[in-house]
């Protein structure tokens, strides 16, 4: 499946594809051997090959035979001795009705088993110092096809060297030691699969929901900035709004997710293939690099998840200003960073502890997945489809195609996930959720007690879930896409578990997860007739503007603007009366030709030069907000504010000119462009001479 681990979001994706759902496949089959003495008994794990003889499934059906210790003598016959049968009857052979325990030598398992069978033994335990010992890779083939070797009729199993020492220490001096070999049925399912299911679905749901909240917060900030441009009736409010806007911009810069482009998808898949091949050929060296990358990413992810919670506590106020510097250090965040680093170091030290270290690994893994889902964003459904299908092809290739090119016939993905059999480090990739088996089985004694799920099976579909929730926030669809995609992920994971149970082998989980999430998202978008918006990610075009940001149209003007219009009418009437009384030469109506319009836009309000290039050439015609460009997220509707036209020519007004100028300057909207640094553009009718 997939693999993950890095500090930066892009680096984390480069390792996303190395983790698998595939549980390590056993070389041979696992069984148990029950060792019984007068006052002591214990079960040990063995690895046997069903190519010879299958072991009984129940202990009651397994013969309890005497144990013969042959570890101090060599046990490798010559090839010619295979065809020399014993003349004596089975009862007269030295190992009759015994199970022989011998050391691993230079000959094959078959040779040792044939020699024990020829001596009358009913079973053979081969002691091996190697880990992950295979039972089938050491079977020798006869050099002469015309003389086939005789078939084995006794079970041959591999016992670990440490277990042999434990048996000898407990049975020292005891002459009556008996053993029974059996292979109990493994449970088809285990309760730990339910825990893995909850962890995976919960992480995907939480990560997608968090990403959607960030999108909603960003949209609210933009709407607040859009409405804040007209609220400048006093200088204090203006300064406060500017400071708040700068703080918002800083937060957006720190929390802004990284958009993932199709070019990045190709680069990630190419580099992931390279990393997979490096792990396949240089596993013992490169696995430590992966552990280091996971440690850095996990500590960062844990910090990013806990920091927002810490910011709501009273301890947030404690800060320390560095002497001679303008930088302040927040003590709670500094302590939190140290705590996250300590947790990661604790896991690194005890990562191979099977009893409790998996709790730390799962905690760090969930935090890391949430961090990546927050910080990496697929901006369109087109990018999501390309990304998920590329990883699906990557997964299928390394699971089903690579066995055609490997010497052992196993896929590179399985070798990397379970670790090479000849690995000297015995390390495992940490980019997995692992939960121990909760039911007793042979795997519990055989150091195979965990079920695993790769981070890639969580994060890769999680990107689509996060995109769906962001789109919900943009089109205000009551989280329809988010809920549908999350349920589809849960169903796909259940199908993966069922397929693994039915086929008795690991499954490429992305084959089911990608199919279920993509098809469900497409179906929802098609039913809602939003496929084009969903495909291009243009959901923000449907967000209604705030009332304070609407154009100056009679039907959309707020109560505050209506009061200002009423005040304008009263002021105009007073001007008309003054003109009629003093000069009698002016008309009593200012009319449409007396109107002056100030065109404002968000670009002009936020641009350092005070105007935008797109504002050149605009006229005083009525603008429909639906016809304005929506390509740039910062482009807002133009706002038109009616102002009072300076009244007639100076030669005709006399001292009324002075009175009107003084009166106009006292109006709250006059001089707005001077205080705000905005460009004022007069209409053609306002510039025409009287």
Swiss-Prot record:
Residues 615-624 have a biased composition (Polar residues). This is Signal peptide peptidase-like 2C. Glycans are attached at residue 106. The chain crosses the membrane at residues 193-213, 261-283, 285-307, 329-349, 355-373, 385-405, 449-469, 483-503, 505-525. Interacts (via active sites) with FREY; the interaction stabilizes FREY1 protein and inhibits SPPL2C proteolytic activity. Its EC number is 3.4.23.-. One of its GO terms (molecular function) is molecular adaptor activity. One of its GO terms (cellular component) is cytoplasmic side of endoplasmic reticulum membrane.
């Amino acid at each position: 499946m997939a693999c993950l681990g890095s500090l930066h979001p892009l680096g984390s994706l480069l390792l996303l594809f190395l983790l698998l759902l595939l549980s390590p496949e056993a070389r041979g089959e696992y069984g148990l051997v029950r060792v019984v003495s007068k006052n002591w008994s214990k079960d040990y794990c063995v690895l046997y090959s069903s190519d010879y003889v299958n072991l009984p499934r129940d202990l009651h059906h397994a013969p309890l035979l005497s144990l013969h210790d042959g570890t101090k003598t060599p046990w490798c016959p010559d090839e010619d001795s295979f065809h020399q049968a014993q003349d004596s009857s089975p009862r007269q052979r030295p190992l009759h009705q015994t199970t022989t325990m011998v050391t691993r030598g230079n000959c094959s398992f078959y040779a040792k088993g044939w020699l024990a069978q020829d001596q009358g033994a009913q079973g053979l335990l081969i002691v091996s110092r190697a880990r992950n010992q295979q039972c089938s890779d050491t079977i020798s083939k006869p050099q002469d096809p015309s003389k086939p070797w005789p078939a084995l009729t006794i079970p041959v199993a591999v016992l670990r060297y440490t277990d042999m020492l434990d048996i000898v220490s407990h049975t020292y001096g005891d002459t009556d030691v008996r053993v029974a070999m059996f292979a109990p049925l493994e449970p088809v399912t285990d309760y730990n699969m339910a825990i893995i299911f909850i962890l995976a679905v919960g992480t995907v749901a939480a990560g997608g929901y968090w990403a959607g909240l960030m999108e909603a917060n960003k949209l609210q900030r933009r709407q607040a900035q859009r409405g804040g441009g007209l609220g400048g009736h006093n200088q204090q409010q203006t300064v406060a709004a500017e400071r708040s806007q700068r703080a918002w911009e800083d937060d957006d810069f720190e929390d802004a997710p990284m958009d993932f482009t199709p070019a990045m998808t190709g680069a990630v898949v190419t580099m992931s293939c390279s990393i997979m091949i490096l792990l396949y050929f240089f596993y013992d060296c490169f696995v430590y690099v992966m552990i280091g990358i996971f440690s850095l990413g996990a500590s960062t992810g844990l910090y990013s998840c806990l920091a927002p919670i810490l910011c709501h506590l009273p301890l947030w106020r404690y800060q320390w200003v560095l002497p001679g510097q303008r930088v302040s250090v927040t003590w709670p965040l500094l302590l939190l960073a140290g705590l996250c680093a300590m947790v990661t170091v604790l896991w690194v030290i005890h990562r191979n502890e099977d009893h409790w270290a998996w709790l730390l690994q799962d905690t760090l893994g969930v935090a890391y997945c949430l961090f990546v889902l927050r910080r990496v964003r697929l901006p369109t459904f087109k990018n999501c489809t390309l990304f998920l299908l590329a990883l699906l092809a990557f997964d299928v290739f390394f699971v089903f195609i690579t066995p055609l090119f490997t010497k052992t016939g196993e896929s590179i993905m399985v070798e990397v996930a379970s670790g090479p059999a000849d690995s000297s480090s015995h390390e495992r990739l940490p980019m997995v959720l692992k939960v121990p088996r909760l039911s007793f089985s042979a795997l519990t004694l055989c150091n195979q007690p965990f079920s695993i799920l790769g981070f890639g099976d969580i994060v890769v579909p999680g990107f689509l879930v996060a995109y769906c929730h962001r789109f919900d926030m943009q089109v205000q669809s009551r989280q329809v896409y988010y809920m549908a995609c999350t349920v589809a992920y849960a169903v796909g994971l259940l199908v993966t578990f069922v397929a693994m149970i039915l086929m008795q082998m690991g499954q490429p989980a992305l084959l089911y997860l990608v199919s279920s999430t993509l098809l469900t998202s497409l179906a929802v978008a098609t039913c809602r007739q939003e496929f084009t918006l969903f495909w291009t990610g243009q959901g923000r075009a449907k967000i209604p503007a705030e009332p304070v940001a609407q154009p100056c149209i009679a039907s959309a003007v707020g109560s505050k603007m209506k009061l200002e219009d009423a005040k304008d009418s009263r002021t105009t009437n007073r001007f008309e009366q003054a003109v009629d009384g003093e000069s009698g030469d002016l008309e009593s109506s200012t009319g449409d030709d007396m109107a002056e319009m100030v065109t404002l836009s968000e670009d002009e309000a936020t641009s350092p030069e005070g105007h935008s290039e797109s504002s050149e050439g605009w006229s005083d015609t009525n603008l429909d907000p639906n016809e304005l460009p929506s390509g740039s997220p910062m482009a807002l509707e133009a706002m038109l504010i009616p102002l009072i036209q300076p009244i007639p020519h100076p030669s005709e007004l006399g001292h009324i000119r002075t009175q009107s100028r003084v009166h106009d300057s006292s109006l709250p909207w006059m001089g707005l462009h001077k205080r705000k640094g905005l460009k004022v553009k007069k209409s053609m009718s306002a510039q025409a001479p009287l």
